[in-house]
Amino acid sequence: MAYEAGKIEKKWQKIWQEKEYFEPKDDFSLPKKYILSMFPYPSGRIHMGHVRNYSIGDAMARYYRKKGFNVLHPIGFDSFGMPAENAAIKHGIHPKKWTYENIDYMQNELASLGFSFSKKRMLATSDPLYTKFEQEFFIKMYEKGLIYTKEAEVNWCENDKTVLANEQVEDGKCWRCGHEVIRKKMPGYYVKITAYADELLQDLKKLEGKWPSQVLTMQENWIGKSTGLSFDFDIEENNKISAKKINVFTTRAETIYGVSYIALAPDHEIVNELIDKKLLDQDVIAKIQNIQNQTPRQRQAAPKEGYFLNLYVIHPLSKEKIPLWVANFVLSDYGSGAVMSVPAHDERDYEFAKTYNLAIKKVIYKDENDAQCYTLKEGVLTSSGEFDQLECNDAREKISLKIESLGIGKKVTNFKIRDWGVSRQRYWGAPIPMIKCDSCGIVPQKIENLPITLPEDVVINGEGNPLDKHETWKECICPKCGKKAQKESDTLDTFFESSWYFARFASDDKTWQEKAVDEKSVNYWMNVDEYIGGIEHAILHLLYARFFQKALRDLGYLKDDEPFNRLLTQGMVTKDGAKMSKSKGNVVDPDYIIEKYGADSARLFILFAAPPAKELEWNDSALEGAFKFINRLYEKAMSLECGKLQEIDHQSLNKEEKYARLKVYEALKKSFEVYEESFAFNTLIAACMEALNALNAINHKEVSKEAFYIILNILEPIIPHVCFELSEYLFKCENFKVLKIKDEVFIKDSFNIAISVNGKKRAQIEINSEAKEDEILALAKENVAKWLEGKTIVKEIYIDKKLVNLVVK
């Protein structure tokens, strides 16, 4: 009988759905596994990256179900976002219609791959019910002071006409559309993620060994904790500006005597005052304003650029005059937006000083080091007044104490991470549940009025925010004073939705209407045991999700400190050496692959071609190879007799039969480690292939039947359709359970021993495992007889089952 992938796969997909095989059980006494792959944006079609992500998660989920665990393996759609609006402009279709049609299509695609997702817990973040509880969280966070409003410089994408968080700007471009990003001052809502900066940093220790070290390092660097000294420089008396002092922050207080200039951020208040009063040359003002329009990343990537501001400050200890500059490498949102620049001991300061011919003052020496820029925190101070000859660490402490005693500074801790701006000037997003009242100011909506949903009668043409122009939708009554007011027209950053979806999935779907999260269910399922997704989410989604977990914990919704126990970051799928994309013309359509080869072949190839964390290069011939392997597996299985297994007397088997059985049980042993620890599915598949090759060399019915009983069990999480089909035919699926290792299979009948003469290896022999030492020595001498001729054996050394060494003279 020929292997018909399409027929077999449709049959089993129907059976699994009808039997609700993928739904989690209500029995909370069972051991649980919560396995979650990052949910997709409903773009309209799944791509091979999705296939890889979900094949990995599905293999884990199926394995643990078979092991008797209660498994939660949900899927949903991150369904708000700008592409829906862009589609509305391009194709004249409403974002809602476009989104939900795409969801329907993609659900069918995912089902056709046999992914074992819970259908009852499927959600879309644009569903009104999801919006309702998200808005509830927003209001609770606002009331707790975790969300606030302010006017600030923001990243603005001219193409998408919306604000972007710092994390959403990549190399000066919008992460979504790739358009240049500019800086713009706007009011907006901010999530106070900085309130949790220290906990977010400290709790990374809990994830060591469970998350990739690269992700932990990226988050640690993004949070950017630094402890140092914050202190003031007096501004030399002048009639130009109102400020009298400039505050700076440094982690290198020991270099204070090496300051040769103070550098201000381009948008520092002193710089803006000089521009407003036109106290700088017009061409300088134009150049500074150009820098102000650049994003922080654009500024840092650009060549060092700066301008003297015709002002001086007074050094707090040496009382020297120090020039005041504006520089593009100083960021306004780190420290106070002012840097004490020490060119002799900081490479960036040195580069700027060399460019503009500024003084370079060495104040640290080590071993007569004459480097122009010495950056190590080791050595002794020089040209530092009363602190000369002190070691760096000692000097840092004593200078800090001196500054504190003068009342002009103190030790502080700074973080690089900034509060998360979540206001977006777009239509297709969750409305921010706030009201603007002329009498009361900003007021939250009443919880009982949620959800605040989007109007559908909007014109989407790419010109501003449609909600801002929808007067009837904006009109409302202030819940505080009862007067006419207006709804907030901004919508939430879509990362707000993806920051808590894992908790929603963990809630009992029977309580979804009443509660954001169901306490009993969430306490059982959380936290996520295995989380699978791309490393590109290391800072954005994963950091926001960790913050949300902690914030919702403190609001009483959740109990755990961290949302994801283990994280697996899968590599991207490439073709012709590049990431798959329509623009490169190297996209592989999963629908075509399923149609031609079947879902199991696609899954087998994707898990065999590379370890999950590595890049996977698409290879048509390897896919063909996966298809042929399944065909051979099918043909061999169909040639076997059905029925129960018979006991096998291992000792009665010949050498080839014992070897085949050993290979099968080695694969079984490996399966436990792969599915539970390493996820190196490629090595497990290779072990199964090796076992099947060994089976082809024998003709023992019971050994072959036992082998398939085990191999179909091992491969079911990877190629489920064909394994169910063959297991039903051969064993009525009784093999889908936890299988035990049989120790007798691993007992060797013989072993190899190296034979050396005077320490030099001369031969290797195979010895029966029951042979005695004198028999082994006799056989050894026989095999190296030519090296013993004319010699006397003075010593015989035998190391059990490893080595014989004959010492002769």
Swiss-Prot record:
Coarsely, its chief localization is cytoplasm
Q: Where is this motif: 'KMSKS' region?
A: 579-583
Q: What single Pfam family name could you report for this chain, choosing any that match?
A: Anticodon_1
Q: Which InterPro entries does the protein's record reference?
A: aa-tRNA-synth_I_CS, aa-tRNA-synth_Ia, Leu-tRNA-ligase, Leu_tRNA-synth_edit, M/V/L/I-tRNA-synth_anticd-bd, Methionyl/Leucyl_tRNA_Synth, Rossmann-like_a/b/a_fold, tRNAsynth_Ia_anticodon-bd
Motif 'HIGH' region, per the record, lies over: 40-50
Keywords, alphabetical: Aminoacyl-tRNA synthetase, ATP-binding, Cytoplasm, Ligase, Nucleotide-binding, Protein biosynthesis
Quote the subcellular location field of this record. Cytoplasm
Class of enzymatic activity (EC top level): ligase
Question: Where does the record locate the signal sequence feature?
Answer: none
> EC annotation?
6.1.1.4
Source organism superkingdom: Bacteria
- Does Protein biosynthesis count among this protein's keywords? yes
Q: Which CDD domains match?
A: Anticodon_Ia_Leu_BEm, LeuRS_core
- On whether ATP-binding is a keyword of this UniProt record, the answer is yes
User: What is one cellular component GO term in this UniProt entry?
Assistant: cytosol
Where on this chain does ATP bind?
Answer: K582
Q: What family is this? A: Belongs to the class-I aminoacyl-tRNA synthetase family.
HAMAP family, per the entry: Leu_tRNA_synth_B
Q: Which NCBIfam families match?
A: leuS_bact (TIGR00396)
Protein name stated in the entry:
Leucine--tRNA ligase
Q: Which organism is it from?
A: Campylobacter lari (strain RM2100 / D67 / ATCC BAA-1060)
| Gene name tied to this protein | leuS
